[in-house]
């Protein structure tokens, strides 16, 4: 082998070593760039869910609640559609309650694995709202917690909705009490139903 060929082989080997050394750093830089683009909203990561993911999710199972449902943990074993409200419920709130009832009915045999909950920061509902819920929403659970306790949930929901330039309509909570997704006026019943059917299909029945 000539001296020129030997030098070529040496440089080729060095080049391969340099490439092997650079690959991990290149991947780290690429991952960092992609992460920053996703976080800034410049690119999106495709997913099956229709709702807006709450990141990170908010744990509600330890939330001190006064509830119309007699249970140690009202979240356990069921996917819950949460309508956040107060002493009164405006027309938008009433429409959301109606939508949640329609979705619940359309789940058919899977309806027993889901529930609806009106989560209020008022210790008592107005007489008109109480009468309306009693007449129109027999299977709705009503729960109360004070505003400071609900603040982490409210802040997470607001941030999630505002990031999409939307207004939150209701929240989906998993069977372990994690607030997972937010739905806004952009989501119709079909979108919510699609998410719920997918989640019920791939989650264990309790």
Enumerate the predicted regions with their spans:
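Structural beta-sheet core signal
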Residues: 81-83, 116-119, 172
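Short active-site neighborhood of thiol/selenol oxidoreductases, capturing the structured segment around
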Residues: 73-101
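N-terminal targeting signals for export/organelle localization
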Residues: 1-62
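Short, internal strand/loop/helix patches
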Residues: 115-117, 124, 128-167
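Thiol-/selenol-based redox modules, centered on thioredoxin-like
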Residues: 165-206
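Extracytoplasmic
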Residues: 76-78, 111-113, 165-167
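Conserved helix-turn-beta segment immediately C-terminal to the redox Cys motif
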Residues: 98-117
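A glycine-rich, hydrophobic loop/mini-helix early in the fold
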Residues: 55-76, 83
